[in-house]
Amino acid sequence: MDKATTLAPLSSEAALVKLLDQVTRAVASGASVVMGGGRVDRLGAFMQPTILADIKPGNPAFREEFFGPVALFFRVKNEDEAVALANDSDFGLGGSVFTQDVARGKRVASRVDTGMMFVNQATWTLPELPFGGIKNSGYGRELSSMGIHEFVNKKLVRVASIDALM
């Protein structure tokens, strides 16, 4: 990554303080900072693009959501271990799989417990795509034809012959 790369600010100073605290606690619990990890020295709620590695299950970063430019890197031995790691989460909004083997990417995507999965692209949305997560990342869908069903009350009406009751 180009060290001159910058990002937009976080939504608020409070969001930046929370994110910096998460990184500090992760490092105190054994995570390594590959790059970044701090505030950008300028006016506003800007944080350096950050990569954390060496995160073990007891680390708070293993269970928390990071809302900002922080990527968590994990080492796994195989596809099954990667899927198990991804699914061992209290959250499930979206995820991405990057691979040259598209069939494998689709297979992995179908096994990961999230509301949205993308193969060879970062998560994103359009009005035509259903948006929503599972677990602690939400319930139901917004947008698309799936989203409109969240606003529809469905009713079952079952009719039997009156003679069948006698």
Residue ranges of model-derived segments:
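Conserved C-terminal structural/oligomerization subdomain of aldehyde/semialdehyde dehydrogenase
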Residues: R39, F46-M166
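ALDH superfamily catalytic-core signature
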Residues: M1-P57, L85, V119, A164-M166
